[in-house]
Amino acid sequence: MRNFDYSKKWEKLLTPEIVALLTQIHEYKGEQSLFIEAKADTLTQLVEIAKIQSTEASNKIEGIYTSDARLKALVKDKTTPKTRNEREIAGYRDVLNTIHESHDYISIRPNMILQLHRNLYKFEGYDIGGKYKAADNIIEEEDEQGNKFVRFRPVPAWETPEAVENLCNEFDKALGTGTIDPLLLIPMFILDFLCIHPFNDGNGRMSRLLTLLMLYRAGYIVGKYISIEHLIEKTKESYYECLQESSLNWHEEENNYVPFVQYMLGVVVAAYRDFSDRVETLVASGLSKQERVAELIKNTYGEITKSQIMEKCPDISRITVERALSELLTSESIIKIGGGRYTKYVWNRDKE
């Protein structure tokens, strides 16, 4: 049985890169906690957008899709799921909402993890949710020729309940010492959870929900306003590379947590940076939405796409962004590069 004692393992994580990321996150947390309290009403739009992006991205990583219109309707609970994909999306939506609303009351214990997994599959007709895997599972990869091979063999089914119990106990024990930064413990826990792979299905989505929950419980609430799952989905190649690197020799307890921990901390830093940028955009005083689009392009040193503008200005509709771009092109304030889906824009500094 794998040993999950974190009391010494965390010390190996204190590389210059990881320490720098920890410092940035602590600084961001200190800067933005006061703003969150003072500007809670202003951030309502970010919360709703983050829910949609989180639900879409985490399911998309696992190949679970629906149309944009159906996704938004499902996340806002304005329709009922019609397909298996939509049932899984609706389940994710509900667990995500539970974490946002009740994170203080959801401890990191096996019974709570099973409850969240049961809710993840509550719209399914078959009885899969809330149960550990009944048979051993493997993690496969496919090469460029389409040949499949085993990348990792998780903990056997018969060991899984005890492994999850031990994992939660050791995490709780390490957290209770007060000497280990939770930002180090959380990705270590998540890596071990993924190596156990406790369920027949839903392990990846559960790992991302647990990441959000644990960040919340540690006082890092950026995931309420910026989708952690969306940032992972955008960098999923790096995610899988770091996961694979950190899981090598896991069963022998000789694995290196550093790649995965560094990746996850980088995601949290990116979330805080994104949050800071969006907050500045939302509270820009005295500017119309079209003027905000212009300011964003002007302050971007290089090219920017329409989708990037919409991501930076989530409260501005596509039509308004397109109208602003059209007006800026007409006035020659910006330059259009390329065409179609590859169109980019850059500020015309010769006009200044």
Spell out what each predicted region is.
Residues 1-352:
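FIC/Doc superfamily catalytic core
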